[in-house]
Amino acid sequence: MSEALIGGGAKKVYILSRRRDVLESAAAKHEGILIPIQCDVTSKASLQSAVDIVTKDSGYVNLLIANSGTLGPTNRLDHDLSIHELRKNVFDNVSFEDFNNTLSVNTTGAYFTMLAFLELLDAGNKNALKGGFGGPSTEGGAPSIQSQVIFTSSLGAYSRDRLSPPAYSASKSALSHLAKHASTNLAKYGIRVNVLAPGLFPSEIATLMTANRDPATENLGDRMFIPARKFGGAEEMGGTVLYLASRAGSYCNGLILVNDGGRLSVMLSEY
């Protein structure tokens, strides 16, 4: 995402992560443009520290992507098990702490990230009115590209398939509704809220679903068939983010954009 934004002309991109080594490695590729900030989204103090750094450095943001995520417990409601085995798998073998931590990172952490940056997003709109990015297309008008939050949800938010881990699915489903709620209630302030719900893109979280697979060789009879016959890649993700961030996507607010190669259309889902 950050690579796409920089390639699209972003003057500065702040990247937040708990892992300093990941931050420093990413920032080294774009020194002075990609700014690393160590941050834990489950800590209000850490979020405030990140906000303070951005406030001091630039004073505003035009776009906030809340991309935090953890898979959490992978114990599923597997109907190949007996009812005794099923209970043991999902009750005895999963702790309240592990289940709730999934929601803490994926839902609460993402939501509080948005809340922490509200004033900086508002400042982004004010900067646009002064001639900055997203300035009015007509004199005296509103910003042509209003400040925006993009929440990264997931295909899992809409999945009813037994392969979907319940904690992860619940956390992303909750996030999608929080985003819709926020888009309604932040409209007064000119802050847009949209959701990106990706399917299978190779990543740490997706390893369980992508390892030892070649979607190009699969067909409709395969349980995890993807109609596009490929996993998502940098172009699909980067292009989608650029669309939402640009004038082309400036009319989107409260949108759930599913980017999944058609996977949702061939599985048990709620979408």
Swiss-Prot record:
InterPro entries: NAD(P)-bd_dom_sf, SDR_fam, Sec_Metab_Biosynth_SDR
TM segment ranges: none
Gene: SAT3
Name recorded for this polypeptide: Short-chain dehydrogenase/reductase SAT3
Keyword Lyase: no
Family indicated by similarity: Belongs to the short-chain dehydrogenases/reductases (SDR) family.
Pathway annotation: Mycotoxin biosynthesis
Broad EC category: oxidoreductase
Enzyme nomenclature, EC number: 1.-.-.-
Keyword Ribonucleoprotein included in the entry's annotation: no
Keyword entries, A-Z: NADP, Oxidoreductase
Binding site for NADP(+): 17, 40, 67, 168, 172, 203
Catalytic residue list: 153, 168, 172
Function comment: Short-chain dehydrogenase/reductase; part of the satratoxin SC1 cluster involved in the biosynthesis of satratoxins, trichothecene mycotoxins that are associated with human food poisonings. Satratoxins are suggested to be made by products of multiple gene clusters (SC1, SC2 and SC3) that encode 21 proteins in all, including polyketide synthases, acetyltransferases, and other enzymes expected to modify the trichothecene skeleton. SC1 encodes 10 proteins, SAT1 to SAT10.
GO molecular function term, any single one: oxidoreductase activity
Additional remarks: Trichothecenes are sesquiterpenoid toxins that act by inhibiting protein biosynthesis.
Species assigned in the record: Stachybotrys chartarum (strain CBS 109288 / IBT 7711)
Upper lineage: Eukaryota, Fungi, Dikarya, Ascomycota, Pezizomycotina
Database matches in Pfam families: adh_short (PF00106), adh_short_C2 (PF13561)
Superkingdom as given in the UniProt entry: Eukaryota
